[in-house]
Amino acid sequence: MEKRSKPNGPRRVLLLTGASRGIGHATVKRFSAAGWRVITVSRQPFPEQCPWEMGPEDHIQLDLGDPVATEAMIPEIRARLAPDGGMLHALVNNAAISPKGEGGARLGTLAMPADGWLRVFQVNFFAPILLARGLVDELARANGSVVNVTSIAGGRVHPFAGAAYSTSKAALAGLTREMAADFAPRGVRVNAISPGEIDTSILSPGTEKIVQEQIPMRRLGRPEEVAQAIYFLCTEASSYVNGAEIHINGGQHV
């Protein structure tokens, strides 16, 4: 039976990066429905017309592309966790960037400028480990879980995802295994989910061809299907799952 956070009891707490749309938005809804407190991280300030039942105390404005600011924010995040016993039950590293060229063109290894590579890796790769390492005590206190969001583009050359994005996701998959080995003795599980073509606002023209030619299920994935897998990895249902990367792509990877 699924455990829920009780209204008058200890709340489970999720820290989620990249919550404004798509997979992140669906993840907020899935965890909130189960009674979790969800703290979001974004470059943008807390929106006045927030679509969720949360206040400014559950939003952290942070540019994950700034490594100094990211590390400096750790004490503030800890302070936000204090009302819940200084416990963090789940960290989901969902935020990512994938710059495009003129007219939305894919940026390959020869086209992406050096500063673009650095920023992509800072947001997609370094920020996840900076947050997880900085909050390891809070995660350990709750026997928590970390979920890194990788991508099918991390395992193959993708027609739309840029080279920097793809290699950063491949690196994040490797980081997930390393973290799983290092964090597990502290009681913290670390896993990844690897989405394929998901029906979000960032789909590129030509995705329909991929759906028809490469995906055995012949459809796009839904954000809520990804959110459900993330939720699974953050609950007791996956209590012996550690170091895994779950492919959510309708069989596109086979």
Regions flagged by a language model, labelled:
Residues 20-21:
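Conserved glycine-rich cofactor-binding loop
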Residues 94-106, 251:
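Conserved NAD(P)H cofactor-binding loop of Rossmann-fold oxidoreductase domains
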Residues 98, 108, 113-114, 145-171, ...:
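Catalytic loop of short-chain dehydrogenase/reductase
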Residues 102-118, 211:
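Substrate-binding pocket helix/loop in short-chain dehydrogenase/reductase
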Residues 137, 181-182, 239:
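Alpha-helical segment proximal to the catalytic Tyr-Lys
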Residues 143, 184, 189, 241-243:
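Short, small/polar-rich loop/turn modules that mediate ligand/substrate recognition or access, typified
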Residues 222-253:
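C-terminal substrate-recognition "lid" of short-chain dehydrogenase/reductases
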